[in-house]
Structure formats: structure tokens, C-alpha cells
Amino acid sequence: MAKHVVFDEESRRALERGVNSLADAVRITLGPKGRNVVLEKKFGAPQIINDGVTIAKEVELEDPLENAGAQLMREVASKTNDVAGDGTTTATVLAQALIREGLKNVAAGANPVALRKGIDKTIDALVKEIEAKSKPVAGDAIAQVATISAGNDTEVGQMIAQAMDKVGKDGVITVEESKSLATEMEIVEGMQIDRGYISPYFVTDAERMVAEIENARLLIVNKKISSLQDLVGILEQVARAGQPLLIIAEDLEGEALATLVVNKLRGVLNVVAIKAPGFGERRQAMLQDIAVLTGGQVISEDVGLTLDKVDLEMLGTARKVTISKDNTTIVSEAANAGDVGKRVEQLRRQLDETDSEYDKEKLQERIAKLAGGVAVIKVGAATETELKDRKLRIEDALNATKAAVAEGIVPGGGTTLIHLTKTIESVKAQLKDEEKVGADLVGIALEAPLTQIADNAGKEGAVVVEKVRDADFSYGYNAMTDTYEDMIAAGVVDPAKVVRSGLQNAGSIAGMVLTTEALVVDKPEPAGAAAPDMGGMGGMGGMGGMGGMGGMGGMGMM
């Protein structure tokens, strides 16, 4: 395909137009009084949204040169979302301001490479300042962070704070769509496995169709069990001990399953069997997790253990096990806490070493199941449009809360960025010549988020910025109540990680745009060029005479 190549000022201006098209659509959502954006969908009702990254992903421009600029801005929002889970609109506003001011200087003859160096060095210094000013998050601050990110929804803020308190910082909190109108939370204590009973004959509560056993023994086997002979020895020992038994195996079939079911129905043995979770190497690892949690051993031929050699000491113990058709929840004894802690540390090290997003997600899940538990927030709303918007807000709030726990909090509402402008002068003292102009660009860009928040609230942004700049570090403008106050005391806080990653990603993309000298894009195809003229095909109408082919029936030579 032919390419369109543009150079110098023309390439940078095309990028800027694309940047502005996307950023102008995103920035109107910033702050507590930000507006909504309606996204047209090819199928179904339009989506009303207030989430920066979702809007950014929908913008596709007709002009390929401008679209390249829009794609770069989309990268700012996506990268910030990946790292911090929130703050995408702030990052977009910062990047737009840096690019706008930077291109003015490049057009006036400034050296783009020196500008980029100045921007990078200044942002590095500001990141250190953010780290120094951040405060650890505790108590009510968790609910405050979640409330701000959920668009000042106090109910959601309290719910997320409660979930974090229940499952701990290693726990997993998931967001699902509810079947009702209310938004509610469900806490699953213990380890939950996505496997249910092998046979419905194992249930102990026929009304709820679940099997519940207490003070149970666990036989954890990394193989398929089909022969009853393999199980006889251990079943006799468990029966003598008078305890219920949960068997976790690759599969259970044939006479082994039939005998267990018969013994269960006759009341000889209280037993339930489930299939092992996961596949391949991950199955082996998850069985080991269960063994550590319950203080048992995995019976595997890989380590020289076979079923005929198993005794009670090798079985795990659980305070309570609940098995439904699809899930099993194991609540372990507190005595195994030391071993569980060591296993969690081992998994954390694996988490730090892996690059795969999928592996990271699975490891995080395993850590949560071992260390804390799982909380599920079920989002309800009157219409599907409201449900989607609410779900996105809750996901943002959840991500912001995790970011706050990771790196602490700073004053919110654009306040921290304004007060960081005071450190620009000390940074400039260490820079050379035109690099200082890069530092000034960052100083101007830092004002953009608060200006936009004030504009969206119907105030004069420039006036608000000057008022906040002259005050203490935690003093800022609360757009929700239209007052100037101590933002941390008022509960208007941002996770330091969100502010940091937004600033870094904005600086990165701005530096790339400023140092662009050429732009290469696909040439749009002329309208109608792809479809050749089919008019000449009209003569095919004469094919009607083929009806005479019926005479071919005489070919029956066989």
C-alpha cells in the first residue's frame, strides 16, 4: 500500500490536531463536576460514560495523520490505566498541555532534543518529590480514595474500604454485574476452588444442593483414581477416626466412585470427592497450595508417594468445607498460618520475577486465596447504560484504592501538581540552557488539571490556580463543595501512584511528539477505487439456454 509522508512543522501540526481531538473529548470529564460523553455503539444503545480511558479507546479519526496523534494520546491513557488503574483523564490533560506548549517553542526555533531532556529530568525530580510528600493510607483514607474515584459515591467508597479490611491487601476484590437493582458485596472466606462435587449423591443438604463437612480430612492426589483397591486402606483409617473426608483428585471414576457413593448413601462414611483445579503444571502448583493451607501432603508418584502407602498424618485438615455444584470453599485451621506465610512469600517472589500478565494474574489470585480471601462487589442499576457506567466507576475506585495502599496518598483535585510547580526553580538550577525551557513547559502543564477541574465546575481556572499556588502543600480547591480547604482533612486525596504514573506517561509521549520530524501513514484509497466496474457482466443473461443440459442423462455407460 502506498504511503503518505510529511515532514517538519506539517507532521507536528497534524499530530497536534489529533492530540487535541482526543484530549478535548476526554478532559471535559475531569473532576467531581465533569460532564459525560455519549459513545455511539454499532449494536445496542449508546453508552453514557465518564471514564477517560474508555473514551480514548473509542476515538478513531478519519485523517490518518491526525489519527496518529490520537493513537499516541490513547497510549498515555492506556499505560496510566495499566500501571495505576485510574488517573487517565489527568494524564491526558497533562500530555495535551505539554505538547501544546512544547510545539510553540519548537516552532519558535527551540531545540526539541534539549526540550525533551529538560522535560525528562524535571519529571524525574518531581516523582521523587511526590514520593517524599506521600502519606501512608490508613483507616478512613481508604474509603475517601475510593469515594473520590467512584465519582463521590460514598456507598461505593465504604463498600470497597470494607472489602479491603476483610480480605487484606493480598486479597482479591472482583466486580461483577448483579441481577438486582442494589449494589452489594459478598465475602468468601477461605480458599475457593472452581470445582464442585463429582456426583450429586455426595450432597448433605438436598434443598440447597450443597455438601458441608466440618473438621474434615483432605486426601490430595495428583492422579486419576479408578480402582477401589487404591483407596481401601486410607478409607478404613478415616472411618476408624470418625472424621469426614474430602478427596481432591485428577478424576474419580469406575468402581472407586461407585463404592464411595454407596458407602455415603448407607451412612458408613461421610465422604465427598471433587476434581483437582487447573491443568498441567498449574494443577500441581494449586494442589500444593491446598496441601500447605491444610497441613497435608500431595500424594504424587513424582515424589515416590502412592495411595497404598498413605496414612492419616499425610492428610490435610480443614475446619469447614462447603462444596456446591460448581465451587468448593475450604476454611483451614489457624495452626497452619506459619507455613501459609512462607508459601505466600515464595509466590510473591515468583510474581516479581514473571513478565507475563496472565501468569501475574494467576499468581495474584493464588496469593489471595492463600492469604486473605475473595470479595465480590455485585453492581446493580436500573438500566444497562447506568450499570455499565457504574461498573466502570467502581473498577476505577478499586484500582485507585490498591494504588493508594501501594504508594500512599497526596492531596487530590490537582492540588499536588500545582504545589509541585514550586520545586521547578530548584530543578532548573541543575539544567543547561534550553533544558530549562523544558522545565518551564512542565511547570505550565502542571497547572492544566486544576484549571480544567475549575472550568468544569463553572469557575475561572486561572484565578483558582493562583489562589492555590500561594497556599500550603495540602491546601487546595474542593470543586465538589466550591471551597478552598485542607484537602487531606477534607478527604479529597489521590493515590501517589496515580499522580506519578500520569506525570511520567504524559512526559514520555510529549517528548516523542516534540522530537518528531516525519510522519509516515497509509495513503487513503480514493472513493470507489477498490470496487471494479461490474457493468460489463450484463451479457451473462444468455446463460438461460443451459436448460438443454438435461439430455446428459444418457451418459449411463456404467
From Swiss-Prot:
One of its GO terms (molecular function) is ATP-dependent protein folding chaperone. It comes from the Bacteria. CDD domains: GroEL (cd03344). Pfam families: Cpn60_TCP1. Gene3D superfamilies: GroEL (3.50.7.10), GroEL-like equatorial domain (1.10.560.10), TCP-1-like chaperonin intermediate domain (3.30.260.10). Its EC number is 5.6.1.7. Keywords: ATP-binding, Chaperone, Cytoplasm, Isomerase, Nucleotide-binding. GO terms for biological process: protein refolding. It catalyses: ATP + H2O + a folded polypeptide = ADP + phosphate + an unfolded polypeptide. ATP binds at T29, L30, G31, P32, D86, G87, T88, T89, T90, G413, D494. It is found in: Cytoplasm. InterPro entries: Cpn60/GroEL, Cpn60/GroEL/TCP-1, GroEL-like_apical_dom_sf, GROEL-like_equatorial_sf, TCP-1-like_intermed_sf. The keyword GTP-binding does not apply. One of its GO terms (cellular component) is cytoplasm. Forms a cylinder of 14 subunits composed of two heptameric rings stacked back-to-back. Interacts with the co-chaperonin GroES. Belongs to the chaperonin (HSP60) family. Together with its co-chaperonin GroES, plays an essential role in assisting protein folding. The GroEL-GroES system forms a nano-cage that allows encapsulation of the non-native substrate proteins and provides a physical environment optimized to promote and accelerate protein folding. This is Chaperonin GroEL 1.
